[in-house]
């Protein structure tokens, strides 16, 4: 019904209403030349060929041919919004970062939510981790906290990342999603058990983007004004409450409204129901890290809250929708290596790998000057360096300033106060195999202590419902891993698989076929 349309559906109506007092703009080419006729090409006579001189046509088509840019290799489907971060608690004893400077300070932010494995046209309601990336526009440059909706990940070594993503994408020959690929990789890498268990729990399908938590996931380092450092983890917990979709509702929405998450976020902000998240940190001293029972930089594990409680910091609030999706969401580029003074990287191997991979893929997808794009530009800091030229240089290229360092002409100077915190590091240089690290203790705690009986039942049903489509030998490897977590975990999944495997395949697809003679008669009638 027209009178029940939501703000997202009425976007063009609202755009027109906002411009009601204005005359329509003059239609132009990309170069600003007025266009006299946008409906008809120039031809020799009404039936003749086109003329090369029809620059209105060539301008239009040449741009159309180049509208698409490379899709993100992961996190292709996403929604974005803008707002602010406000400090509510003092953590300057941990970090000198200006974003945390004083209680009440507000910093502009941009946020992008996303699924991971699907293409840009895929459904928002699939079972998949969600990206939750936050860009803080600070006076010391941008800080990009490129997180997910889970505090852990599938792997702990970045060398495995391309293979992991390949296993979640499409088969290189059939171009179909392949359960053999997915479960073969997971079953061969038992460090994935923690994230797999989280993924197939109720939280594996969040109800849109507003009702899920976010996590920096990695271990980071905070440095205060005295040069003292601690390790930390970032958490941002939804103020809307956790809500998840049932398998049935998710499947229905994937057909009826595959952009459900984008629509829900847009409409909430458009109706001034601004979503917010409370921002926390966990802190671990260097001495605590030395005596920690496992590697504190292992991305497949969490820091227990009873030992490292959440410390409140502030609020993330989203109060503006994108003005243009391509300009502000498709082109936004998050980079974990964007860290202002007071926030630094830890030895977390996965974080170290991302420090290179993210800016590298942005230079491929958006070009070497992607930081000139307005949504990526650190507009609250003055950029002054010795980088010049390159495709799509959209600013003044730093004018006549020297492009070499050192120099004697008063060009930008290094700032000792921005030096990274010094750390000691020693050990043999080699490739360390961490596959046999403890992969089950925290998963067992999640299964036994975090989930209740109904949640455990749904977890096992969800896993078996997906694993059943993999080959039997892969099923056995996966069940062996789940059994090592807890015998009940493995036995429940195996019992469900036995039931699936005993059933004969059913063809549930109903088709409607027209006879050849009927089609021939229709064709003859159209002559």
Curated annotation (Swiss-Prot):
GO terms for cellular component: catalase complex; mitochondrion; peroxisomal matrix; peroxisomal membrane. It comes from Pongo abelii (Sumatran orangutan). GO terms for molecular function: aminoacylase activity; catalase activity; enzyme binding; heme binding; metal ion binding; NADP binding; protein homodimerization activity. The keyword Secreted does not apply. The lineage of its organism: Eukaryota, Metazoa, Chordata, Craniata, Vertebrata. It is found in: Peroxisome matrix. Its EC number is 1.11.1.6. The modification N-acetylalanine is found at residue 2. The active site is at residues 75, 148. Catalyzes the degradation of hydrogen peroxide (H(2)O(2)) generated by peroxisomal oxidases to water and oxygen, thereby protecting cells from the toxic effects of hydrogen peroxide. Promotes growth of cells including T-cells, B-cells, myeloid leukemia cells, melanoma cells, mastocytoma cells and normal and transformed fibroblast cells. Gene3D superfamilies: Catalase core domain. The modification N6-succinyllysine is found at residues 13, 221, 306, 480. Its main location: other. Heme binds at residue 358. Belongs to the catalase family. InterPro entries: Catalase, Catalase_3, Catalase_AS, Catalase_clade1/3, Catalase_core, Catalase_haem_BS, Catalase_immune_responsive, Catalase_sf. The modification Phosphothreonine is found at residue 511. Signal peptide: none annotated. This is Catalase. NADP(+) binds at residues 194, 201, 203, 213, 237, 303, 305-306. It comes from the Eukaryota. GO terms for biological process: aerobic respiration; cellular detoxification of hydrogen peroxide; cholesterol metabolic process; hemoglobin metabolic process; hydrogen peroxide catabolic process; negative regulation of apoptotic process; positive regulation of cell division; positive regulation of phosphatidylinositol 3-kinase/protein kinase B signal transduction.
């Amino acid at each position: 019904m027209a009178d029940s349309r939501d703000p997202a559906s009425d976007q063009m109506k609202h755009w027109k209403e906002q411009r009601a007092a204005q005359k329509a703009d003059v239609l132009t080419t990309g170069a600003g030349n007025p266009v006299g006729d946008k409906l008809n090409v120039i031809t020799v006579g009404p039936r003749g060929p086109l003329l090369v001189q029809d620059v209105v046509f060539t301008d239009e088509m040449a741009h159309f041919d180049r509208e698409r840019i490379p899709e993100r290799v992961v996190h292709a489907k996403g929604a974005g919004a803008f707002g602010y971060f406000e400090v509510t608690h003092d953590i300057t004893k941990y970090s000198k970062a200006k974003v945390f400077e004083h209680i009440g300070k507000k910093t502009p932010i941009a946020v992008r939510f996303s699924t991971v494995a699907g293409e840009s046209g895929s459904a928002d309601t699939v079972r998949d981790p969600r990206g939750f990336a936050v860009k803080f526009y600070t006076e010391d440059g941008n800080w990009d906290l490129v997180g997910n909706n889970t505090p852990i990940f599938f792997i702990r070594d970045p060398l495995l990342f391309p293979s992991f993503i390949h296993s979640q994408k499409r088969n290189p020959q059939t171009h179909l999603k392949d359960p053999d690929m997915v479960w073969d990789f997971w079953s061969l890498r038992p460090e994935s058990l923690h994230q797999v268990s989280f993924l197939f729990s109720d939280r594996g399908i969040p109800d849109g983007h507003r009702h899920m938590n976010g996590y920096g996931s990695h271990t980071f380092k905070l440095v205060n004004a005295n040069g003292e450092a601690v390790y930390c983890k970032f958490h941002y917990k939804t103020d809307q409450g956790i809500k998840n979709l049932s398998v049935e509702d998710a499947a229905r929405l994937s057909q009826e409204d595959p952009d459900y998450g984008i629509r829900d976020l847009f409409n909430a902000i458009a109706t001034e129901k601004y979503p917010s998240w409370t921002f926390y940190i966990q802190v671990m001293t260097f001495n605590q890290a030395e005596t920690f029972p496992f590697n504190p930089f292992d991305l497949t594990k969490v820091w227990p809250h009873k030992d490292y409680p959440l410390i409140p910091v502030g609020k993330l609030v989203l109060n503006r929708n994108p003005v243009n999706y391509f300009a502000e969401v498709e082109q936004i580029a998050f980079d974990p290596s964007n860290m202002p003074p007071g926030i630094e990287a830890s030895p977390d191997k996965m974080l170290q790998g991302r420090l290179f991979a993210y800016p590298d893929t942005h230079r491929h997808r958006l070009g070497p000057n992607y930081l000139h794009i307005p949504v990526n530009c650190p507009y609250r800091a003055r950029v002054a360096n010795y980088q010049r030229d390159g495709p799509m240089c959209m600013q003044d290229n730093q004018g006549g300033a020297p492009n070499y360092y050192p120099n004697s002409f008063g060009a930008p100077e290094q700032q000792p106060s921005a030096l990274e915190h010094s750390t000691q590091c020693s050990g043999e240089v080699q490739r360390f195999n961490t596959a046999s690290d403890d992969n089950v203790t925290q998963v067992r705690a999640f299964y036994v202590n975090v989930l209740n009986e109904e949640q455990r039942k749904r977890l096992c049903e969800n896993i078996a419902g997906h694993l059943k489509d993999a080959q039997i030998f892969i099923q056995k490897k996966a069940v062996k891993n789940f059994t090592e977590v807890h015998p009940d975990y493995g036995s429940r999944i195996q019992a469900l698989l036995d039931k699936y495997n005993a059933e004969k395949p059913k063809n549930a697809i109903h088709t409607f076929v027209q006879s050849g003679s009927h089609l021939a008669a229709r064709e003859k009638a159209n002559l």
